[in-house]
Regions:
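N-terminal amphipathic alpha-helix/helix-capping segment at the start of soluble metabolic enzymes
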Residues: 1-25, 118, 281
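Glycine-rich, proline-tolerant flexible connector loops at the mouths of alpha/beta enzymes
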Residues: 27-33, 44-68, 98-106, 168-177
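Hydrophobic or amphipathic alpha-helical targeting/insertion segments
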Residues: 84-125
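Catalytic alpha/beta core domains of metabolic enzymes, predominantly
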Residues: 128-129, 137-284
Length: 351
């Protein structure tokens, strides 16, 4: 795993070997501070670490004052083109700015934003995607290739460095999973700044989760990436659940219950599909535990096949088994199986 430079977003560390931070973005009207705060609280309850809000106009920038004062999460202002919105957002108390300095005007405007960010020790994320690459770079590479996106990101980094600013995070996103992965791998070779991973315009919950798992999960498995955002055309809370599931899948989660289950076969004598879904749903919001839970379809092979699980259940004809590390610890009536498992999880303290 590559150790990058570290930035601090309120009280959340990103990079430098810190745990992978999960991000999301509100889809409320930022000008409606109460609605935005309600969504931020829901994201926090789901396990989100950092939240981003769109700042399309000055009214939204002013609303950030109330939002930032009451948000349980660090707030990132998403700025496009108008440097005055960045200055207003900083004045309102945001914890980080997301912008591309090459898109906000001349050097004097970049310097103004950098000066304000420095005064409050705020990092800036450079956010490049395949649709934002500068014309001269597109012409050089013949399109928004991974190499073009990385050159665009480094161009913006250079603008900030020219202002003696180094508190930087980078994202380089494409809707193409292969292009996204290639871009981040190249960026990881060329820079030590922390990388914010994501696949842009990933789609609805189903396809967007699959694309994000392939792209984000693949990069994390290779040791690349410091913070992640799963982009879904859906409730932002689902982005957080998907992101945390990806972290579990690649072994990078700091907490959470990793539920595994067998695919069922002719030996299955219980409604394993519904049981597995119920266990997964009930485990989703449990905080402060890190463990593996198995849901298996038969008592013959279940405990043995899932011996690496901390806890698990296996169904039979009328009676279910609860096991720990492959050893049977309890038999319970099948209709009590899930409740009995959840009770064991609640009292599990680890080895």
């Amino acid at each position: 795993m590559k150790i990058t430079k570290q930035i601090k977003i309120r009280d959340v560390l990103v990079g430098g070997g810190a745990p992978i931070a999960v991000q999301s973005m509100t889809n409320t009207d930022t000008r409606d501070a109460q609605a935005t705060l309600a969504q931020i609280r829901a994201l926090a309850d789901a396990g989100c670490d950092i939240v981003r809000c769109a700042v399309p106009d000055m009214q939204a920038a002013e609303a950030l004052r109330e939002i930032c004062a009451n948000s349980p999460l660090p707030v990132v202002a998403d700025i496009h083109f108008d440097y005055r919105l960045a200055l207003a957002a900083i004045e309102s108390g945001v914890d980080k700015i997301r912008l591309n300095p090459g898109n906000i005007g001349g050097a004097d405007r970049v310097q103004a934003v950098v000066k304000a960010a420095k005064a409050r020790h705020l990092p800036i994320r450079i956010g490049v995607n395949s649709g934002s690459v500068e014309k001269h770079i597109l012409e050089k590479f013949g399109g928004p290739t991974p190499e073009a996106m990385v050159e665009s990101a480094l161009y913006h980094v250079g603008l900030l460095n020219d202002c003696d600013f180094d508190d930087i995070c980078i994202s380089i996103k494409s809707s193409s999973v292969p292009n996204t992965m290639q871009a981040y791998l190249l960026a990881s070779e060329k820079t030590d700044y922390p990388l914010h991973l994501g696949v842009t315009e990933a789609g609805t919950e189903y396809m967007g989760t699959i694309k994000s798992a392939a792209g984000i999960g693949g990069l994390l498995a290779l040791g690349v990436g410091d913070t992640i955002r799963v982009s879904l055309t859906d409730d932002p809370v689902k982005e957080v659940y998907a992101a945390k599931a990806i972290l579990k899948a690649v072994g990078r989660a700091e907490e959470g219950i990793n539920v595994v289950s067998c695919p069922t076969c002719g030996r299955t004598r219980i409604n394993l599909i519904d049981i597995a879904k119920e266990v997964e749903q009930r485990c989703q919001s449990i905080r402060g535990k890190k463990m593996k839970v198995a849901v298996m379809g038969c008592v013959v092979n279940g405990p043995g096949e899932a011996r690496e699980a901390d806890l698990g259940i296996a169904g039979g004809d009328g009676v279910g088994l609860i096991f720990r590390r492959g050893e049977i610890i309890k038999k319970v009536p099948q209709e009590q199986l899930v409740d009995a498992l959840m009770d064991e999880i609640a009292h599990y303290e680890g080895e």
